[in-house]
């Protein structure tokens, strides 16, 4: 009998722990998102916009690949490889439909520190200059790309390790002000690194703490060595790029295909340099020989991994944070969801696999992602199509870029960073919404400028956590509860029909980046629970019971509810008397709740609001001033609802 029980228990245990076919399929779809969206790809609707976007993206990938490779202190051809392989890997494993992965200015700048430290410029004279190595490049160039590939490999390993540890759920501590300040500071560093090319100067590599200021000190000390030809060509290139891009932005609704000014400028500058022999006549530095084809894969040198661990951590964190911000932005814009942990895996594998093909560290770039928005891309097919055109450049067009002046390439980098640099304008909104966030932005930017992007990011996160820890003990409670007593208090004064369509929620906790998402989830869960449990079916019709629930839930019941009860008006009153403080993320989530409910025909009224909260919400959300939404008390809000009900009834009778 005991043996039979053991056998039965063993069979039950093995059945519970044996993976079913459906579980394996579900796991594959979760870890390979391409299996989820590719079978449902609509060729008729999506292929044309994805193709157009892919062609435009390829232009950006090629130009930025060449430029960011130089920024990473390696030969430009390796930037072309970095524009190809990471995009393919991310299209398979990534969840962002509009995220363009490839070379990235910030990760290139970080990896350049390792390249210049381990293989400095003065080693060029000590290594053989023969072209017998891979791709026909010198041993010096190959040593440099080996270091950059090692940074990419180790950075990818760190990202995959963070995926295994499920650290994606901890990324909420990296707030929007910290990301904005870090990327703006890093973009300022990138512009500074291009000054020597813009001015045509010969300058030693300068890095380390306060290196930003040492570069400008060197420029002013050697101002006489500036090449006027390079300066004029740089200014002309920047003016042309800015003007044409602004015109493209102004007329993008009228013209379906914008002018690829980066590509036109590269062709024109290369042709002019070739015809006038600027390299020898004026001493302009050019890109030089671009090898054809893709070399056989080779593992990065493992013996130098310990020497690049600092840069690898910087690449892993900075690249992931910047990419995740873009992925979350696109998901919010186009109404889909992403998994923060899956993004760790996607970017980690992009860096690991690409490092075997002589690629520099990769991440998503703001300019390329914005380009996908503007050209109407639908899916990652646009990125895969761009890879086809990058391959054409690698195998056919690459050698024609020999005569491209470096000052023109630097101009393309500087103008391409415009989206990051104009984030200085965020200072105004942070000042108006929350001055502490303004202080975090400024201090994070200063630390990034004085040290590096990874140091600035770390400082911003630590500073944010310290401030929240210091503020949270002052909060009275961290719970959200239904304010039933207020319902009973006003029930004798107002008719029951009014109260059936009103839900009163009391928020008795601070609303900051730590709990903004949970606030939204708890709010919706509470509304669903209260509508499901607390309203008796025999007292209220089924339509009345579910109207507010259907309006606020994310299910597919909205149309049905609106059809069955077209004249019902629902109200949600948020009692904000428990607000002790808030930040930019909290105000953003509160405005999002207001907008979501408004889109579902639910009026949101806020009671007991402080003057600072009213000012912040009005400034952030551009709220409709014609309808009052802020009230001194919950009773005042309910009285407002009751008067509106009476007015609507009077208007209905008058129409009859």
From Swiss-Prot:
Which InterPro entries would you find in this protein's record? SLC26A/SulP_dom (IPR011547), SLC26A/SulP_fam (IPR001902), STAS_dom (IPR002645), STAS_dom_sf (IPR036513)
Instruction: State the disease link.
Output: Disease-causing variants in SLC26A7 have been found in patients with thyroid dyshormonogenesis and congenital goitrous hypothyroidism.
Q: Residue ranges of the STAS domain?
A: 492-641
Per the record, the similarity remark reads: Belongs to the SLC26A/SulP transporter (TC 2.A.53) family.
Q: Where is this region: Membrane targeting?
A: 641-656
The protein's location, in the record's own words, is: Basolateral cell membrane; Recycling endosome membrane; Apical cell membrane; Lateral cell membrane
The name on file for this protein is: Anion exchange transporter
Among PANTHER family, the record links this protein to: SULFATE TRANSPORTER
Topological domain (Cytoplasmic) residues are 1-75, 166, 224-227, 276-306, 365-383, 470-656
